């Protein structure tokens, strides 16, 4: 196989829309630039908005678990690829309330934002510019 970056395709799972992911170099390095090694352990799935929405609805209606759009892609891939008698897990990195407008529209509901998340969302973003040099990063960490 040959890695060929593609233009991003916008979906409601916006972090999954990257056509040329910056972290792909890490995957290549981890697997020694071997396509065979990568495909022996990694499979991929892609979903359009309607499918992502369906996974959110199915999961919520079947067990009351509310997925965010990215988790819905992981859940869908697990359901699509899991073989009979296999057990699998999927992980989510965000609370569905981070995508409240999207989830509300999918479920035709008004989901609640947990108090702790509400407080966090009211906080001020703090960023400190650093160079790409490890020594500068280390110096900053040692200073705090």
PLM regions: where:
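PLP-dependent amino-acid enzyme catalytic core
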Residues: 1-144
